[in-house]
Amino acid sequence: MSQAQENEHAGPAVPQTRTARHRRIVDILNRQPVRSQSQLAKLLADDGLSVTQATLSRDLDELNAVKIRNNDGDLIYAVPSEGGFRTPRVPLGESAKEERMRRLSAELLISAEASANLVVLRTPPGAAQFLASAIDQAELHDILGTIAGDDTLLLISREPTGGQALADHLLRLAQNHH
């Protein structure tokens, strides 16, 4: 397989910057239990990010990562949540992430409009980034990415004409949440 073909299947390119590395560390720690720095280094290497133990230790310190006991009683790394909640918490399970997205959609979603593969969501002032974070963490396969301002989110559908179906889905979630 050529280098170009390998890159096609490798997923999105990850820049080798400190900020990108920090973002990837937070993503990993929020998605799965990580018990050691060596395990985290392996997971980063799997994503094409090679780091030394000293760099990883410094990164974890800069991210205010701590070890906490998860629901199974294991000590795992955790980072403070983004937004107002600064206390590190055990990562939410998939159903909890989806439920959080449903609940926040019901509370915050004012409207959803689509065009081609784009969806524009409106929220009350100051709430767009909060809802975008919940949508990102729910990891819906149909969503390629989100961009949030103060009261507006832009969602990008993976499908070229998937915007309307995605808008309808989010509106249904907001209306059907109990």
From Swiss-Prot:
Keywords noted in UniProt? Amino-acid biosynthesis, Arginine biosynthesis, Cytoplasm, DNA-binding, Repressor, Transcription, Transcription regulation
GO term, biological process aspect, one: protein complex oligomerization
What subcellular locations does the record give? Cytoplasm
Q: Region annotation Disordered: residue ranges?
A: 1-21
* UniProt-listed InterPro entries: Arg_repress, Arg_repress_C, Arg_repress_C_sf, Arg_repress_DNA-bd, WH-like_DNA-bd_sf, WH_DNA-bd_sf
Write one Gene Ontology MF term: DNA binding
Which pathway is it part of?
A: Amino-acid biosynthesis; L-arginine biosynthesis [regulation]
Q: GO CC annotations?
A: cytoplasm
A Pfam family matched by this chain, by name? Arg_repressor
Q: Which domain of life is it from?
A: Bacteria
What is the stated purpose of this protein?
Regulates arginine biosynthesis genes.
Family the entry assigns: Belongs to the ArgR family.
HAMAP family (UniProt xref): Arg_repressor (MF_00173)
Kindly give the NCBIfam families that the UniProt entry links to this protein: argR_whole, PRK03341.1
Mind telling me what this protein is named?
A: Arginine repressor
Origin species: Streptomyces avermitilis (strain ATCC 31267 / DSM 46492 / JCM 5070 / NBRC 14893 / NCIMB 12804 / NRRL 8165 / MA-4680)
Q: Lineage of the source organism?
A: Bacteria, Bacillati, Actinomycetota, Actinomycetes, Kitasatosporales
